[in-house]
C-alpha cells in the first residue's frame, strides 16, 4: 500500500561548449556524494504548480545565477519513482549558460565541475538522474522534446510527450 506522500524536485543542467556543469553534492540528507545537476532542490510552498519557479530559485540560491545568464531554458524530462515510502517527481531542465563572466560557479552545496558530454560514463549519480543523462546523451540532446520517465527497480522507461 502506498501512503500518497510526494517529494517534488527540480534541477537544471547548465550547458556550455558541449559540456555540462555537474555538482558533486556533499552533506545533504537525501542526495550526498553523488554527481547531480548544476543546481536544484525541493519545491517550496507556492511552487507546487511551477517547476520553473522552483528551479530558478534554487539556481540563484546555490550558484548566484539568474535567468538573465541563461538561454534556451527548457523542461526536458519529468521522472517518477516510488522510493522510501514516497512518490518522487523530478523535473529536469537544461539551459545554455551564456554569461561570459560566469566560468565555473561556486556552489553552496558542494563541488562544481564541467564535464564533456562524452565524459560522464561511470560517474556516480542518483538512480533516475543516471538514466535521464544517458537518455539525454543518446537521444535528448538532438531534439527539443519533453520526455516522461517511469522508474522501477530495473531502470527508467522514457516516452516523449
Language model: regions and residue ranges:
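Conserved Nudix-box catalytic region and its N-terminal flanking loop in Nudix hydrolases
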Residues: 19-60, 65, 156-161
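A short coil-to-beta-strand element that immediately follows conserved catalytic motifs
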Residues: 66-77
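Short, solvent-exposed aromatic-acidic interface loops
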Residues: 25-29, 79, 110-111
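Active-site-adjacent beta-strand/loop module that shapes the phosphate/pyrophosphate-binding cleft
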Residues: 18, 78-103, 113, 117, ...
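Acidic, metal-coordinating catalytic segment for phosphate/diphosphate chemistry
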Residues: 1-11, 16-17, 28
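Short hydrophobic/aromatic beta-strand or adjacent loop that forms the aromatic wall/cage
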Residues: 7-11, 88-92, 130
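Charged phosphate-binding loop/patch that engages nucleotide di/tri-phosphates or the phosphate backbone
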Residues: 136-161
Amino acid at each position: 500500500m502506498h501512503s500518497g506522500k510526494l517529494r517534488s524536485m527540480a534541477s537544471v543542467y547548465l550547458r556550455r561548449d558541449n559540456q555540462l556543469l555537474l555538482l558533486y553534492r556533499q552533506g545533504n540528507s537525501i542526495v550526498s556524494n553523488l554527481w547531480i545537476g548544476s543546481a536544484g532542490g525541493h519545491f517550496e510552498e507556492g511552487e507546487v504548480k511551477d517547476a520553473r519557479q522552483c528551479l530558478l530559485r534554487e539556481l540563484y540560491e546555490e550558484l548566484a545565477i539568474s535567468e538573465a545568464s541563461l538561454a534556451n531554458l527548457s523542461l526536458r524530462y519529468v521522472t517518477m519513482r516510488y522510493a522510501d515510502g514516497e512518490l518522487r517527481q523530478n523535473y529536469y531542465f537544461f539551459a545554455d549558460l551564456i554569461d561570459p563572466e560566469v566560468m565555473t560557479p561556486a556552489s553552496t552545496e558542494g563541488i562544481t565541475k564541467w564535464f564533456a558530454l562524452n565524459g560522464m560514463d561511470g560517474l556516480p549519480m542518483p538512480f533516475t538522474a543516471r538514466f535521464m543523462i544517458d537518455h539525454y546523451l543518446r537521444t535528448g540532446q538532438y531534439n527539443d522534446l519533453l520526455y516522461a520517465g517511469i522508474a522501477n527497480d530495473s531502470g527508467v522507461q522514457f516516452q516523449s510527450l
